[in-house]
Amino acid sequence: MLMLLVRGTHYENLRSKVVLPTPLGGRSTETFVSEFPGPDTGIRWRRSDEALRVNVGGVRRQLSARALARFPGTRLGRLQAAASEEQARRLCDDYDEAAREFYFDRHPGFFLSLLHFYRTGHLHVLDELCVFAFGQEADYWGLGENALAACCRARYLERRLTQPHAWDEDSDTPSSVDPCPDEISDVQRELARYGAARCGRLRRRLWLTMENPGYSLPSKLFSCVSISVVLASIAAMCIHSLPEYQAREAAAAVAAVAAGRSPEGVRDDPVLRRLEYFCIAWFSFEVSSRLLLAPSTRNFFCHPLNLIDIVSVLPFYLTLLAGVALGDQGGKEFGHLGKVVQVFRLMRIFRVLKLARHSTGLRSLGATLKHSYREVGILLLYLAVGVSVFSGVAYTAEKEEDVGFNTIPACWWWGTVSMTTVGYGDVVPVTVAGKLAASGCILGGILVVALPITIIFNKFSHFYRRQKALEAAVRNSNHREFEDLLSSVDGVSEASLETSRETSQEGRSADLESQAPSEPPHPQMY
C-alpha cells in the first residue's frame, strides 16, 4: 500500500490518497481519506452542535445547527447531519479542513435569500434571476415550490408559464430588448461570405453603406437621398390625380387611340413624366446594386424589403413590355392595354413601403404583424361571428322596412361597420328590434376588438424598443471598432473560443485560491 499527499481543488489543503496494488493488467484503486494518517482514529469528524461554515460564491456565512435542524431535507441540512467527511464532500464543491469551511460554486444572491429562508421559513423570488435559473438554484439547495412565500408563489408560477413567450408580453425587462444571439450569428454568417468573394472587403463596405443608415456618413447621405426620391415619387403620383392635370385626359386619350398610338404618353404631364423616369432610374439602381452586392442571392429574394423594392419598379417595366408586345396592333388593343396600365399604375402605391427600410416604426409594425398572425386570426374570427349573428338579427327585424336590409349579405356591410365602431350612417335600422340589435352589435364590437389589440400593442412596443436599441448600439459605437468587429467575423474558430474559455477558468481558479485567506474571518452567525 502506497500513501501519497494530494492537493484539494479549491483550498490549499492536504489529503492522503491510498493506492492499493492490483494484479498485473488491472487498475489501481485510489481511495481518498479525510485526514492524514487515516480515518481510523476513533474521533468524530464534526460535532453535531457545531456551526456550519459555508462559502457560496465568495459570500461567507456561519449557520447554527439549530437553524439547519429545522429543515433536514435541504442540502445544508443534510450537510450538517453528514456522518463522515466523504459523505459531506458529495454535498459541496470543496472543503477546507483548516478553516472547516464548505465551498459552493453557486449564485451568491440566491444564497442570501436562502439565509432568509432558514430564518423565517419562507423563500422570496429574486427579480435578478429568470424563473428557470431561480428554479435550478432552488432545486440544488433542496427547496420545493412549497417553500415559496405566499406573496411570491403566484407570481413565480405565472412567470414560469409565460417565460417562453416573455418577449411577447413581458417586454419591459432589459433582456427582452437585447438582440437575439441567433440573429447576430445569422448576420455574422452572411458577412463571412465576403471573405472568399472577389473584392469582398469593398463589397461588404458598400453593402453596409446601403443597408445600415448609421454605419457611416456616406450611408446617412444615401439614406436621405433614397427617402427624398420615394417622397418625390409619391408626391408625383398624388399630383397627377388632381383635376387640373386631368382636364385634357379624355380628349387626348380618344385622339391617341384613333391615331393608333398609346394614350399613356399623351395623358401624362411632361414634368411629372420626367420625374417618374428619374424615380424609376433611382429605384432600379438601388435594386440592381443590392442584388450585385448581396452576400447571398437566395436570401436577397427572400427578404421582404427587397421584394418591396422589386414591386416598386415592376409596374413600369411591365407597362413597357406590354407596349412593345402590342406595338403593331390597332387601337382596340391599346384600349385594353390602357386598362392593364391603370392596374400597373395602381401598384405604384406600394412605393410608400420603401420607407420601411429607413423607418423604425414601419419595420416594427411589419415584425409585429409577422408575429401576431394568431391574434389577427382570432380578431377576424370574432368579427366574422359577430357580423354573422347581428346581421341575421337585423335582417329579421328590418326586412319589412325599405331601409337597405333586404338580404343577409347586404346586412354584412352594416354589421362590419357597426362592430368596428366606424358608423358611416348610410344604412340605419328604424324599428325598435333593429335598434336593439345595433346596440348589441356596437357593444360587442367594442369588447371583441379590445381583447387581442392589447396583445398586439405589447408586441409592437417590444419590437420598437428592440429596434431602437439596435440602432442606438450602432450609432454610439466607434466606426473603427465596428469595422474591426466585422473584419474578425471569419477569424473566430471553435478552438480559439475553447482556449479562451479554458484560460478564463484557470484565471478564475487562480483568483479564488489567491483570495482564500489562511485564517478566514469570523463569518456572520445565522
From Swiss-Prot:
Membrane topology: Multi-pass membrane protein
Cytoplasmic side: 1-217, 294-304, 359-373, 465-526
Main location: membrane
Intramembrane segments: 409-420, 421-428
TM stretches of this protein: 218-239, 271-293, 305-322, 338-358, 374-395, 436-464
GO cellular component: membrane; nucleoplasm; perinuclear region of cytoplasm; plasma membrane; voltage-gated potassium channel complex
Name of one Pfam family that matches: Ion_trans
One Gene Ontology molecular-function label: voltage-gated potassium channel activity
Extracellular-side segments: 240-270, 323-337, 396-408, 429-435
Regions of compositional bias (Basic and acidic residues) in chain numbering: 499-511
Short sequence motif named Selectivity filter, residue ranges: 421-426
Keywords: Cell membrane, Ion channel, Ion transport, Membrane, Potassium, Potassium channel, Potassium transport, Transmembrane, Transmembrane helix, Transport, Voltage-gated channel
Signal peptide: none
Annotated spans, Disordered: 491-526
Keyword flag Ion transport: yes
Entry's Gene Ontology BP terms: action potential; potassium ion transmembrane transport; potassium ion transport; protein homooligomerization; regulation of potassium ion transmembrane transport
Domain of life of the native organism: Eukaryota
Quaternary context: Heterotetramer with KCNB1. Heterotetramer with KCNB2. Does not form homomultimers.
PANTHER family linked to this entry: POTASSIUM VOLTAGE-GATED CHANNEL SUBFAMILY S MEMBER 1, VOLTAGE-GATED POTASSIUM CHANNEL
Domain notes: The transmembrane segment S4 functions as a voltage-sensor and is characterized by a series of positively charged amino acids at every third position. Channel opening and closing is effected by a conformation change that affects the position and orientation of the voltage-sensor paddle formed by S3 and S4 within the membrane. A transmembrane electric field that is positive inside would push the positively charged S4 segment outwards, thereby opening the pore, while a field that is negative inside would pull the S4 segment inwards and close the pore.
Function description: Potassium channel regulatory subunit that modulate the delayed rectifier voltage-gated potassium channel activity of KCNB1 and KCNB2 by altering their kinetics, expression levels, and shifting the half-inactivation potential to more polarized values. While it does not form functional channels on its own, it can form functional heterotetrameric channels with KCNB1 and KCNB2. Each regulatory subunit has unique regulatory properties that can lead to extensive inhibition, significant changes in kinetics, and/or substantial shifts in the voltage dependencies of the inactivation process.
UniProt name for this protein: Delayed-rectifier potassium channel regulatory subunit KCNS1
Chain's gene name: KCNS1
